C-alpha cells in the first residue's frame, strides 16, 4: 500500500558551466544536495535528482578555440570530466543532461514562439562592437576594457567584477577584442529584445505569493521597483547555441536556453521512463 504521506520531489542544482573543471563551490552544492536527496529517499519519499551542463555561450567558444576544438566536441569532453569528478565524490544523479540537446532546442523554440504571439519580443537596431580583423560582432565576453563606472581595468563587456555594475558592451571604455587583441569599431545590427516591463505586474504578483525567505523576496521586489530594461536575447553568428527561428544569422543568448535546460532534462527523463508529470519543481536561483 502506498504511503499517503509520501512526497514526490524533483531536486535540481545549479548547472555547471561547460568551459572548465568543477570547483569547490560546485562540489559543496552537489554534496549538500546529494545528502538531502539520500535522506528523503530513506524517509520513503519519491525523489528525483536532476542536473545538466550549461553548454552554450561565448566563454565556451573562446576556450574551445584556445584548445583547438569544435565547441560541441569540447563541451562533450568537459561533461565527461564533470561526471567523473562527481562520481569520485560519491555524488549520484537520477539523470544528468546537457543544455545542448534536442529537447532543450525544441522547448526554447516553443517558448519563443509563444513570446512572439504574446507580443513580448521585438526587433531593434542597435550599435554594437565589431572586430574588423575577425569580421564578426562581439558578444559581451568577447570584449575587455575599462569599467565605465569605477574605472577598473580588464573588465568584461557585460559587467564589472570590482564595483558590481552591469552595462552594455558598447559603453565600456577602451574596448579590446579578446579574439584579436585589436580595438573594435562600432556597427549597426538588429537584435531581438524581450520586453521585461510588460511582465512587471505579473512578476510582482508572483513574488507576493512565493514562499521564500523575506530577505530574498525584498531584494527581488526592489529590482522590480523601477522600470525594467528590455533584455537583448539574441547574438550574432558565429555563436555556439541555438538558432532563432526565422532569423538565420541570429542565435539565442545562452541565458535564454540555460534555465529551460532544467525542463529539458525533466522532459527527457519523463519521456524515457514514461512518466506523465512530477509534482514539485524547484530551482535555487533568484535571477
Which residues does each predicted region cover?
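A glycine-rich helix N-cap at a beta->alpha junction
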Residues: 80-94
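Aromatic/His-enriched, Gly/Pro-containing loop or helix-boundary segments
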Residues: 74-77, 94-106, 132-150
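A charged helix-plus-loop insertion that forms the helical arch/lid used to bind
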Residues: 63-76
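Cys/His-rich short segments
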Residues: 119-193
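Short, solvent-exposed turn/loop segments enriched in Gly/Ser/Thr/Pro and often Arg
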Residues: 50-59, 99-104, 126-127
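Structured secondary-structure scaffolds
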Residues: 2-51, 103-107, 150, 173-287
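Hydrophobic or amphipathic alpha-helical targeting/insertion segments
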Residues: 105-123
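Histidine-centered catalytic micro-motifs
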Residues: 20-27, 93, 97, 123
Amino acid at each position: 500500500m502506498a504511503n499517503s504521506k509520501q512526497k514526490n520531489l524533483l531536486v535540481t542544482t545549479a548547472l555547471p558551466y561547460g568551459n572548465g573543471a568543477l570547483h569547490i563551490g560546485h562540489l559543496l552544492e552537489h554534496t549538500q544536495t546529494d545528502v538531502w536527496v539520500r535522506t528523503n529517499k530513506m524517509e520513503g519519499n519519491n525523489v528525483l535528482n536532476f542536473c545538466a551542463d550549461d553548454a552554450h555561450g561565448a566563454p565556451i567558444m573562446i576556450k574551445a578555440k584556445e584548445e583547438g576544438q569544435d565547441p560541441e566536441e569540447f563541451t562533450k569532453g568537459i561533461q565527461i570530466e564533470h561526471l567523473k569528478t562527481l562520481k569520485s565524490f560519491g555524488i549520484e544523479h537520477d539523470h544528468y543532461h546537457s543544455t545542448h540537446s534536442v529537447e532543450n532546442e525544441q522547448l526554447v523554440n516553443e517558448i519563443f514562439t509563444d513570446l512572439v504571439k504574446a507580443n513580448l519580443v521585438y526587433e531593434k537596431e542597435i550599435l554594437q562592437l565589431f572586430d574588423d580583423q575577425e569580421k564578426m560582432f562581439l558578444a559581451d565576453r568577447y570584449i575587455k576594457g575599462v569599467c565605465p563606472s569605477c574605472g577598473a581595468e580588464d573588465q568584461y563587456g557585460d559587467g564589472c567584477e570590482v564595483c558590481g555594475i552591469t552595462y552594455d558592451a558598447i559603453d565600456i571604455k577602451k574596448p579590446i577584442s579578446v579574439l584579436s587583441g585589436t580595438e573594435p569599431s562600432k556597427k549597426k545590427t538588429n537584435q531581438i529584445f524581450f520586453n521585461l516591463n510588460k511582465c512587471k505586474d505579473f512578476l510582482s504578483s508572483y513574488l507576493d505569493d512565493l514562499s521564500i525567505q523575506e530577505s530574498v523576496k525584498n531584494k527581488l521586489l526592489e529590482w522590480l521597483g523601477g522600470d525594467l530594461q528590455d533584455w537583448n536575447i539574441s547574438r550574432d553568428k558565429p555563436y555556439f547555441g541555438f538558432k532563432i527561428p526565422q532569423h538565420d544569422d541570429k542565435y539565442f543568448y545562452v541565458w535564454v536556453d540555460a534555465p529551460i535546460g532544467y525542463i529539458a532534462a525533466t522532459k527527457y527523463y519523463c519521456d524515457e521512463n514514461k512518466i506523465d508529470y512530477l509534482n514539485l519543481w524547484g530551482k535555487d536561483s533568484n535571477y
